[in-house]
Regions:
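Sec/Tat signal peptide C-region and signal peptidase I cleavage site
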Residues: 18-22
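Bacterial N-terminal signal peptides
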Residues: 7-16
C-alpha cells in the first residue's frame, strides 16, 4: 500500500520510477530533444526508461523521431532516432539492465536489426557531462561495406566513416568529436 502511494505521488509530481528526481517532465523533454535537429524537436515523441529498460511515453509525437533524456548510466547521453529503431533500442536497454557494461556493448551484441529502415537517422549528444558532450549522427545502411560505399571503416573525428561494416547493424557515422577525445564516454 505504501509503495502504491509513493508511486502514485511520483506520477502526480511528474516523475517516473528510475528517472532523476530533480528533473520535471518538462525538463526531461527539453533535455531529450537536445540531440534532435531544431525543426524536428517540437514534434518528436519523448520516452523515458525504467530500471529494466521499459519505455514510458512522456510526450506523444507528431513526426517519426523518438528522443530519450539522459539515463542512469555514467556520463551524459541523450539520443533521438527514427521510430524504426525502437525495437532495437528497447532490446539494447534491456541488455543494459541485464548487465551489459556499456551502451555499445549492449547494442553490438545483436538484436532485431532487420526492421530498421535503410537510411534511418540516429542523433546523439554524448560526453562525460552535458557541457563536454559531442554530437554524433548515424545513417543506417545494413550490410554496407567500405567497397560498396567508398567510406573508411576506421573512426574519424571529423568526417564520415562506416561502423560495423558488413553487418545488419552497419551505419555511416558522423562525429563532431575533437581529436584526442576518447572513443566512448563512460557508460556509452
Amino acid at each position: 500500500m505504501r509503495l502504491l502511494f509513493f508511486t502514485n505521488l511520483s506520477l502526480l509530481l511528474g516523475l517516473l520510477p528510475g528517472t532523476p528526481m530533480a528533473q520535471s517532465v518538462t525538463d526531461q523533454i527539453a533535455e531529450a530533444t537536445l540531440a534532435a535537429p531544431e525543426p524536428l524537436r517540437d514534434g518528436a515523441r519523448v520516452i523515458v526508461r525504467d530500471t529494466e529498460g521499459r519505455p514510458t511515453i512522456l510526450r506523444a509525437g507528431t513526426n517519426s523521431l523518438i528522443c530519450e533524456p539522459d539515463g542512469p548510466q555514467p556520463g551524459f547521453g541523450v539520443e533521438c532516432y527514427h521510430r524504426s529503431f525502437q525495437p532495437v533500442m528497447d532490446w539494447t536497454y534491456r541488455r543494459l539492465a541485464e548487465g551489459a557494461r556499456t551502451y555499445r556493448e549492449a547494442y553490438a551484441d545483436g538484436g532485431p536489426e532487420a526492421d530498421i529502415n535503410a537510411g534511418a537517422m540516429q542523433y546523439a549528444l554524448i560526453g562525460s557531462t552535458q557541457e563536454d558532450a559531442v554530437a554524433t549522427m548515424s545513417i543506417k545502411l545494413p550490410y554496407a561495406t567500405a567497397d560498396s560505399t567508398g567510406l573508411p571503416t576506421e573512426e574519424r573525428s571529423n568526417g564520415p566513416w562506416l561502423m560495423w561494416a558488413g553487418t545488419a547493424a552497419a551505419h555511416i557515422m558522423f562525429s563532431t568529436k575533437p581529436p584526442g577525445v576518447p572513443d566512448e564516454s563512460p557508460g556509452r
